[in-house]
């Protein structure tokens, strides 16, 4: 905490002080244990600290009492009160595994309770009742969670260490910002499949520089016009009438509340649209993701689109995208989309192969999908784009080549292509655990399928790589949503499950009632790293662009790295830029990760605060 910084404490000492201060706020604690039958038992008990020791006062009528007598497995939970939390879903909490010791009645027992009853007068009435007992609690190991991405493990010897989080937000092995010798040489053994795997390094590095603020504090920031005039709106519609087998994201099977959700979206558009900050913005991109936005009824889509146009200034060349499935579209909806400026559709195909469509739980056969895509292109004047997933169980090279051929034959304007990622909580994850589906991931198979799909489309000479997972038809799809994202543009997130950033504040909408807001206190430095991360999502990186963000010394280190990668066949190093090969695109997120580590001080010589180049000068303040 800020109040400790002036006292000369180390970071670990400050963390200990914060944790100790957190415990001091409590007069009771939630207690969990296990019954003799192995069932979890939960209750609560009055809690008191005296002369450096911790005590609870329990009653034999509690269900957990007999378990405490026979079971050493006990955990305490201290959790912030709802009334004082910034958001109920983000309450600070501390869990401790503990050992308990019954305090025998005697002089010490009476002394402790004499002090206990000063803070809890009920002790005076119950201390002499035989069914009440005083227990000493010895803290063992614990975990303190102080924010949505900030947690600390506490060892039995009271050492406090920060929990390292992966890009997905799950605890993972510590992401060392030092570059290993194998990484330096390009000897990768595990492939990073998504941008989040590499950009997560930046998020983790800077998460300490963020603080949670309230909605009212955010809207105070929005009272001023924006400095950067270009902006993006992202709208999330978390409803589907059929859930893909690989999906564990924020989606809901459709029910009767689409009308309520429409009302919610319109109210959000109005709320943000009236702020001076958003009024000063020219919206360059509107992107509806999900879920399946086209699951909304025609009149609901009209209300939503009309509200966007009424509340925001959309540029004449605004890219307006909706994600969709084929079975959720009809001619009436297409007419409404075009009426309100929708000029890009992203269709979740995933696979044309019958086997793949069955495994991924898709609707329609290959022939039906092909026919419906042709009809869509005939009736919709904008871009028609698709998503393709490869390396699903037992997929063959012939099947992925056929996917590429159909994309080319239909003249699809762009296609995303992702290697299948199994996420906890998806149907596919459950099937694998229950042995009803076998997934034997092989890196070499992943490579073969990736190369076969990519090279087949490139061989037509009608397609080119736009970024690591996006192939576009030449002269057609610009995919400005991802370009503006990589540039660090403001993205206003609307809808449950939506995430974005405006006014240097990260926003994530949890439900219709709650969102959390994390304001960055180190904006300039963090944004520069994000720009570097964005540069390395493309097949070509020009040195002139890179030098805007790094010192000459760091650039020289990176250039040596590029030559190593060139020797591995990942790229060609030209006089003015690097150009990734097919193999380099496959390893693109790994390459981006190593570059970011180098810039974060991974060579052991420089740290993040020293690498940036501003007006020809270097310095920590820049």
Predicted regions located by residue number:
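Canonical Radical SAM [4Fe-4S] cluster-binding loop centered on the CxxxCxxC motif
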Residues: 227-262
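An N-terminal domain-cap segment
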Residues: 2-69, 444
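Short glycine-enriched loops at secondary-structure junctions
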Residues: 79-83, 236-240, 417-424
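Short, structured beta-strand-loop surface elements
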Residues: 63-122, 129, 139
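C-terminal scaffold of the Radical SAM
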Residues: 223, 254-274, 284-289, 293-552
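Flexible, acidic/Gly-rich N-terminal and inter-domain linker regions that tether
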Residues: 173-230
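C-terminal edge-of-domain segments
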Residues: 1-17, 123-176
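Charged, E/D/K/R/S-rich low-complexity terminal regions of large eukaryotic assembly subunits
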Residues: 498-622
């Amino acid at each position: 905490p800020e109040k400790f910084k002036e006292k000369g404490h180390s970071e670990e000492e400050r963390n200990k002080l914060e944790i100790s201060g957190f415990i001091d706020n409590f007069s009771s604690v939630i207690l969990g244990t296990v019954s003799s039958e192995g069932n979890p038992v939960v209750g609560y008990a009055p809690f008191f600290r005296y002369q450096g020791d911790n005590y609870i006062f329990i009653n034999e009528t509690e269900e957990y009492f007999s378990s405490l007598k026979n079971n050493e497995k006990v955990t305490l939970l201290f959790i912030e009160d709802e009334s004082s939390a910034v958001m109920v879903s983000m309450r600070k909490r501390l869990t401790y595994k503990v050992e308990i010791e019954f305090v025998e009645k005697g002089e010490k027992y009476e002394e402790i309770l004499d002090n206990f009853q000063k803070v809890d007068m009920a002790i005076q009435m119950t201390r002499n009742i035989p069914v009440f007992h005083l227990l000493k609690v010895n803290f063992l190991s614990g975990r303190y969670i102080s924010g949505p991405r900030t947690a600390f493990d506490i060892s039995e010897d009271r050492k406090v260490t920060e929990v390292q989080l992966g890009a997905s937000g799950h605890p993972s092995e510590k992401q060392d910002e030092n570059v290993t010798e194998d990484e330096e040489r390009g000897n990768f053994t595990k492939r990073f499949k998504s941008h989040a795997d590499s950009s997560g390094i930046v998020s983790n590095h800077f998460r300490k520089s963020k603080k949670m603020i309230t909605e009212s504090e955010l809207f105070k920031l929005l009272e001023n016009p924006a400095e950067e005039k270009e902006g993006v709106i992202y709208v999330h519609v978390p409803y589907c009438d059929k859930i893909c087998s690989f999906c564990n994201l924020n989606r809901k099977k459709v029910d009767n509340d689409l009308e309520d959700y429409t009302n919610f979206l319109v109210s959000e558009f109005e709320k943000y649209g009236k702020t001076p900050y958003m009024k000063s913005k020219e919206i360059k991109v509107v992107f509806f993701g999900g879920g399946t936005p086209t699951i909304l009824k025609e009149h609901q889509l009209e209300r939503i689109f009309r509200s966007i146009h009424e509340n925001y200034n959309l540029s004449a060349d605004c890219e307006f995208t909706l994600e969709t499935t084929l079975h959720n579209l009809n001619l009436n909806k297409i007419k409404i989309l075009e009426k309100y400026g929708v000029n890009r559709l992203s269709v979740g195909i995933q696979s044309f192969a019958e086997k793949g469509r069955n495994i991924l739980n898709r609707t329609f056969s290959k022939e039906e999908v092909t026919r419906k895509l042709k009809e869509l292109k005939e009736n919709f004047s904008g871009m028609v784009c698709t998503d393709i997933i490869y390396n699903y169980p037992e997929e063959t090279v012939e099947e992925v080549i056929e996917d590429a051929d159909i994309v080319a034959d239909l003249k699809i304007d762009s296609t995303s292509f992702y290697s299948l990622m199994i996420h906890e909580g998806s149907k596919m994850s459950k099937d694998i655990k229950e042995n009803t589906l076998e997934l034997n991931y092989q890196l070499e198979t992943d490579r073969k399928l990736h190369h076969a799909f990519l090279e087949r489309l490139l061989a037509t000479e009608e397609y080119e790589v736009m970024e690591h997972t996006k192939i576009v038809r030449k002269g057609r799809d610009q995919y400005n949503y991802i370009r503006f994202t990589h540039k660090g543009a403001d993205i206003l997130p609307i809808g449950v499950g939506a995430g974005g950033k405006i006014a240097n504040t990260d926003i994530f909408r949890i439900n219709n009632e709650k969102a959390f807001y994390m304001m960055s206190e180190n904006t300039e430095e963090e944004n520069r790293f994000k720009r570097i991360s964005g540069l390395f999502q493309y097949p070509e990186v020009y040195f002139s662009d890179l030098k805007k963000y790094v010192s000459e010394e760091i650039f020289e280190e990176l250039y040596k790295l590029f030559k190593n990668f060139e020797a591995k066949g990942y790229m060609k190093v030209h006089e003015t830029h690097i150009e990734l090969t097919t193999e380099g695109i496959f390893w693109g997120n790994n390459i981006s990760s190593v570059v970011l580590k180098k810039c974060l001080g991974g060579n052991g010589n420089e740290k993040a605060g020293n690498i940036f180049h501003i007006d020809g000068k270097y310095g920590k303040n820049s």
